[in-house]
Amino acid sequence: NPEHQRYVELFI
């Protein structure tokens, strides 16, 4: 889901 993707981008 897009919401999870946002957290992935913040993690990297």
Swiss-Prot record:
Coiled coil: none annotated. Its main location: secreted. Keywords: Disulfide bond, Fibrinogenolytic toxin, Hemostasis impairing toxin, Hydrolase, Metal-binding, Metalloprotease, Protease, Secreted, Toxin, Zinc. It comes from the Eukaryota. Its EC number is 3.4.24.-. Expressed by the venom gland. Contains 3 disulfide bonds. Inhibited by carbon monoxide (CO). This inhibition is explained by the presence of heme attached to the enzyme and modulated by CO. The state change of heme induced by CO (carboxyheme or metheme) may inhibit the enzyme. One of its GO terms (molecular function) is toxin activity. Its cofactor is Zn(2+). Belongs to the venom metalloproteinase (M12B) family. P-II subfamily. P-IIa sub-subfamily. This is the first SVMP that is heme-bound and carbon monoxide-inhibited. The heme-binding may serve to regulate SVMP activity during envenomation, with both protective and aggressive purposes. First, if the venom gland is elaborating CO via the enzymatic action of heme oxygenase, then inhibition of SVMP by CO is likely important in preventing this enzyme from disrupting the epithelial barrier of the gland and injuring the snake. This is Snake venom metalloproteinase CatroxMP-II.
